[in-house]
């Protein structure tokens, strides 16, 4: 399937008219703190796009809690509901990380911090660089085979079986590698899982990650636009984070701009662009909701599964 026949289509102007009882729940300063590099999200986007979306997620959350309560009462069981899991997928450089941080902060505010909301990135479930190098797939980092799917499946199972403490692996974009340390999550109510691979399915597995999700979102844009944003972000990082001598990518600050551009284009054409076409984009129609961005990096259309 490669169309939106099973989705309601909301152009931005229609979506923004959806009634939301709560006022703006983020300040300009807070948005600036969580905004990703080269992301053009504004308070207007928060009001017109994200506030109605957070209300929709809250409706889904309350519905899940109600159904669970009714089921437990009927079955005469006393088991608390597992965390409500929101999956957020999409290409590199499309704005997933910023959107995930916006989701977390806005859900915290929506529920007046009466619900524990956690954010997890699937980067932590990549195999360490050492393993990728041993297997000869360092140039496939981000592809399905570069992830520890067993570890990710255990993580999701632990969440959905109400394990009291769930281990979360950590990743550093600075060192470009999985960290040795982890963090623990304790009884979250809502978990946002962000990553390029969250909606991918391995046909050899008995369970798909999507089996564990309560709501899923795909960040979409034309490939030409994503490629442009990727290059813009690369050069912004080259002038900032890459300047640190400890950065994995520091070496690319020592070459001239043309050489750096050739390198970045090569990464896109042989890795990120290929992964988008072969693996990531195919998962779009598995999502409950698709947020489509225009050339200006702003969300222009929303597609909600019927």
From Swiss-Prot:
InterPro entries: P-loop_NTPase, PanK, PRK/URK
Origin: domain of life: Bacteria
GO CC annotations, alphabetized: cytoplasm
Residues that, per the record, bind ATP: 90-97
GO molecular function: ATP binding; pantothenate kinase activity
Metabolic or biological pathway, per its Swiss-Prot or TrEMBL entry: Cofactor biosynthesis; coenzyme A biosynthesis; CoA from (R)-pantothenate: step 1/5
Alphabetic keyword roster: ATP-binding, Coenzyme A biosynthesis, Cytoplasm, Kinase, Nucleotide-binding, Transferase
Localization, UniProt: Cytoplasm
Xref: SUPFAM superfamilies: P-loop containing nucleoside triphosphate hydrolases
EC number: 2.7.1.33
Catalytic activity: (R)-pantothenate + ATP = (R)-4'-phosphopantothenate + ADP + H(+)
Any single biological process term in GO: coenzyme A biosynthetic process
Protein family (similarity comment): Belongs to the prokaryotic pantothenate kinase family.
The name this protein goes by in its record: Pantothenate kinase
Source organism of the structure: Listeria welshimeri serovar 6b (strain ATCC 35897 / DSM 20650 / CCUG 15529 / CIP 8149 / NCTC 11857 / SLCC 5334 / V8)
Gene: coaA
């Amino acid at each position: 399937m490669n169309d939106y026949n099973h989705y309601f289509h909301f152009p931005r102007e229609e979506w923004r008219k959806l009634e939301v009882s709560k006022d703006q729940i983020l300040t300009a300063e807070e948005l600036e703190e969580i905004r990703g590099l080269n992301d053009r999200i504004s308070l207007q986007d928060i009001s017109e796009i994200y506030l109605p979306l957070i209300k929709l997620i809250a409706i889904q959350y309350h519905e899940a809690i109600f159904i669970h309560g009714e089921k437990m009462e009927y079955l005469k069981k006393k088991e608390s509901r597992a965390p409500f899991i929101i999956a957020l997928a999409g290409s590199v450089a499309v704005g997933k990380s910023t959107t995930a941080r916006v989701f977390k902060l806005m859900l915290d505010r929506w529920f007046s911090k009466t619900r524990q909301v956690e954010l997890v990135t699937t980067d932590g479930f990549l195999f360490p660089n050492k393993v990728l190098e041993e297997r000869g797939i360092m140039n496939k980092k981000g592809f399905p085979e570069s992830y520890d799917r067993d570890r990710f499946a255990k993580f999701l199972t632990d969440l959905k079986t109400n394990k009291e403490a769930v281990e979360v692996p950590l990743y550093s974009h600075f060192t470009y590698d999985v960290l040795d340390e982890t963090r623990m999550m304790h009884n979250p109510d809502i978990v946002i899982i962000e990553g390029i691979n969250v909606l991918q399915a391995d046909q050899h597995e008995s369970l798909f990650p999507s089996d564990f999700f309560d709501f899923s979102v795909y960040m979409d844009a034309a490939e030409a636009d994503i490629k442009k944003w990727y290059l813009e972000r690369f050069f912004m990082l080259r002038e900032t984070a890459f300047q640190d001598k400890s950065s994995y990518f520091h070496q690319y600050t020592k070459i001239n701009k043309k050489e750096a551009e050739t390198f970045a284009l090569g990464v896109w054409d042989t890795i990120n662009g290929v992964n988008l076409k072969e693996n990531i984009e195919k998962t779009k129609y598995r999502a409950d909701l698709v947020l489509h961005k225009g050339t200006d990096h702003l969300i222009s259309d929303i597609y909600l599964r019927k």
